[in-house]
Amino acid sequence: MTDLITVKKLGSRIGAQIDGVRLGGDLDPAAVNEIRAALLAHKVVFFRGQHQLDDAEQLAFAGLLGTPIGHPAAIALADDAPIITPINSEFGKANRWHTDVTFAANYPAASVLRAVSLPSYGGSTLWANTAAAYAELPEPLKCLTENLWALHTNRYDYVTTKPLTAAQRAFRQVFEKPDFRTEHPVVRVHPETGERTLLAGDFVRSFVGLDSHESRVLFEVLQRRITMPENTIRWNWAPGDVAIWDNRATQHRAIDDYDDQHRLMHRVTLMGDVPVDVYGQASRVISGAPMEIAG
């Protein structure tokens, strides 16, 4: 099977398309290893034409790459919360740059996203390479960020700030009901590649030791660096598409350019580890429990 797999690089810093593979829970271990290697190298990988996948097969395939884990805000409210998280435009549009679930100490290592229902136009997703962003920092900013920590919280989420519908308000109340607060290093060391990556995104509320004005200014500086066009890739979804990204080395955002059409994606996230900074210090839980396997 692996003789048929091809990995086509899509950009100099991020993104690859993998062809010649049929995703599912019965995938050959050698093929899984090739996918994992491509993911670490390219940060986000894409698959076309995976129409055979349903929720069960998506979950089974994701389990070959790691340990599936539900959303911590949902798990905090219900022990039987589903492992698959629906990304449903009815309840909000994640159209600000973020890394998934960084308000938890051991936020997800990776995510597997499948297109379920797509608008007739628009609805693309952008990803940014946070390892490349760190590598391109000037030395003064590297020195600053390597000694900086940030407070991440689910009370400052990434959903649009436009006026909310009743469904969106209800979703936000559920999302924010558990109080998650974690202090992460702004530069974390990737546990598999050893790369240094910038850990920011719109779950950041402030930087430790800085006031609100200083935090806002520095946040904008870092986000501008991370989301430079050269660090990004845009994926235009088609039915049957699947994307997998390394959540430890990327940010992403959906593009809200499909008006009032419906967009539904199903996401499986994989258990992550607690970040450590360049000095070996681990992230600190301020409030809320680390992510756990349901049951």
Curated annotation (Swiss-Prot):
A biological-process GO annotation: response to antibiotic
Entry's induction text: Repressed by the transcriptional repressor Rv3405c.
Pfam families to which the protein is assigned, alphabetical: TauD (PF02668)
Keywords in alphabetical order: Antibiotic resistance, Dioxygenase, Iron, Metal-binding, Oxidoreductase
Residues bound to 2-oxoglutarate: 125, 263, 267
EC number: 1.14.11.77
Reactions catalysed: a primary linear alkyl sulfate ester + 2-oxoglutarate + O2 = an aldehyde + sulfate + succinate + CO2 + H(+); 2-ethylhexyl sulfate + 2-oxoglutarate + O2 = 2-ethylhexanal + sulfate + succinate + CO2 + H(+); hexyl sulfate + 2-oxoglutarate + O2 = hexanal + sulfate + succinate + CO2 + H(+); pentyl sulfate + 2-oxoglutarate + O2 = pentanal + sulfate + succinate + CO2 + H(+)
GO cellular component, one term: cytoplasm
Cofactor: Fe(2+)
A GO molecular function held by the record: metal ion binding
Consequences of knocking out this gene: Cells lacking this gene do not replicate in minimal media with 2-ethyl hexyl sulfate as the sole sulfur source, in contrast to wild-type.
InterPro entries: AtsK-like (IPR051323), TauD-like_sf (IPR042098), TauD/TfdA-like (IPR003819)
Ligand binding (substrate): 71, 101
Keyword set includes Oxidoreductase: yes
Keyword Metal-binding set for record: yes
UniProt-annotated binding residues for Fe cation: 98, 100, 252
Remaining remarks: Was identified as a high-confidence drug target.
Task performed by this protein: Alpha-ketoglutarate-dependent sulfate ester dioxygenase, which oxidizes medium-chain alkyl-sulfate esters. Shows preference for 2-ethylhexyl sulfate (2-EHS) in vitro, leading to the formation of succinate and 2-ethylhexanal. Has likely a role in sulfate scavenging in vivo.
Family designation: Belongs to the TfdA dioxygenase family.
Protein name from the UniProt record: Alpha-ketoglutarate-dependent sulfate ester dioxygenase
Organism: Mycobacterium tuberculosis (strain ATCC 25618 / H37Rv)
